[in-house]
Amino acid sequence: MIEVSGKVKWQSRRGMRELDLMLLPFVDIDLPNCDETTLKAYVDLLEASDLELVRWFNGTQEPDTQSRKEIVEFIKKCHAKRMGHEGV
């Protein structure tokens, strides 16, 4: 279990409600149970713009690095699991 800093939690609050609905539960519920590599990938993901993140999460654009692609897919899976859509 890792400690998620207040800074990372604050940076997870974005300017778009759609992103907040994906990222805030992830940072509070799922990320603390991950390893340092996942935390680093998530922190890197937060450097992207809101528009990039929305496009990556809704699948209209591919993330620009493999690391970002993997963390986006992981966040989407965690979100689907929380929503009861594990097989999606």
Where are these regions (language model features)?
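Positively charged, polar, low-complexity stretches
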Residues: 1-88
